[in-house]
């Protein structure tokens, strides 16, 4: 696991985009994408770029259960507004949160992932250490599944809704086992509220109580953090290859 420290989220997006360009130059064709505030600066770099993504396939991590794609709180809507409308892909896959049989939808999504192995997976991390919507206690062997969201996740996501009561209580999420099959993982985290989760992910025991800790076992993970999110990584009793990067403006 390589840790790259950056000045702020904007610089973090630039670094992530540089990593993507390197991956594309090596033949990457399928991107695993995330939502939320952490990857927005990365998507902004993609949108500003002259690169053409029309030969790429994207597979998103998750979607709320019960929201139409036209809802401005759906992740389908988020992706269109932040990336896909400006930069069309060959094919974009997201779980169908309105599927009549959501268990069958989860199985269908696993088949999509199997047919399109992910070359470059973007992740955020929740305050409780979740990746995707894989909450604490999720089996590391889990593939795409229906999730009952924890109160801490509902509260954290309520800032995107009119009220906390409007936040969906379930989601369909790519599982940890599926995420771990990705060839390369880039995790972005910004802000003091992520510091505990980052410390646990990097230095803590590998435990289902902190889902992101499983990333210690992946061969190619790059973590991009600002100083606040990295604030608990400095310790005289812990050793880690921390890279401080300064981008040219």
From Swiss-Prot:
Active site annotation, chain numbering: 62, 128, 130, 135
Pathway: Amino-sugar metabolism; N-acetylneuraminate degradation; D-fructose 6-phosphate from N-acetylneuraminate: step 5/5
EC number: 3.5.99.6
UniProt entry keywords in alphabetical sequence: Carbohydrate metabolism, Hydrolase
A Gene Ontology molecular function term of the record: identical protein binding
Signal sequence, start to end: none
Keyword Hydrolase: yes
Keyword Cytoplasm part of the UniProt annotation: no
UniProt xrefs under InterPro entries: Glc/Gal-6P_isomerase, Glucosamine6P_isomerase, Glucosamine6P_isomerase_CS, NagB/RpiA_transferase-like
Any Gene Ontology biological process: N-acetylneuraminate catabolic process
Catalyses which reaction(s): alpha-D-glucosamine 6-phosphate + H2O = beta-D-fructose 6-phosphate + NH4(+)
Pfam family, one: Glucosamine_iso
One GO cellular component term: cytoplasm
Family: Belongs to the glucosamine/galactosamine-6-phosphate isomerase family. NagB subfamily.
Task of the protein: Catalyzes the reversible isomerization-deamination of glucosamine 6-phosphate (GlcN6P) to form fructose 6-phosphate (Fru6P) and ammonium ion.
UniProt-listed NCBIfam families: nagB
Record's protein name: Glucosamine-6-phosphate deaminase
Organism: Streptococcus pyogenes serotype M5 (strain Manfredo)
Encoding gene (name): nagB
């Amino acid at each position: 696991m390589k840790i790259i420290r950056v000045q702020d989220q904007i610089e973090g997006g630039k670094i992530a985009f540089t990593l993507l360009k390197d991956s594309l130059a090596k033949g990457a064709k399928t991107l695993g994408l995330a939502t939320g505030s952490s990857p927005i600066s990365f998507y902004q770099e993609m949108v500003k770029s002259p690169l053409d993504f029309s030969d790429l396939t994207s597979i998103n991590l998750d979607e709320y259960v019960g929201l139409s794609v036209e809802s401005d709180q759906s992740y389908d809507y988020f992706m269109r507004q932040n990336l896909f409308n400006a930069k069309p892909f060959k094919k974009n896959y997201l779980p169908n949160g309105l599927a009549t049989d959501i268990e069958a939808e989860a199985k269908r999504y696993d088949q999509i992932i199997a047919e399109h192995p992910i070359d470059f997976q973007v992740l955020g991390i929740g305050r409780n250490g979740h990746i995707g919507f894989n909450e604490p206690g999720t089996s590391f062997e889990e593939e795409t599944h229906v999730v009952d969201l924890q109160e801490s996740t509902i509260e954290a996501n309520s800032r995107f809704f009119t009220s906390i009561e409007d936040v969906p209580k379930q989601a369909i999420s790519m599982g940890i086992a599926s995420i771990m099959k990705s060839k390369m993982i880039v995790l972005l985290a910004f802000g003091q509220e992520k510091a505990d989760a980052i410390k646990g992910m990097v230095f803590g025991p590998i435990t289902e109580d902190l889902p992101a800790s499983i990333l210690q076992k992946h061969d190619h993970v790059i973590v991009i953090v600002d100083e606040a999110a990295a604030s608990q990584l400095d310790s005289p009793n812990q050793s880690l290859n921390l890279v401080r990067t300064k981008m040219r403006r």
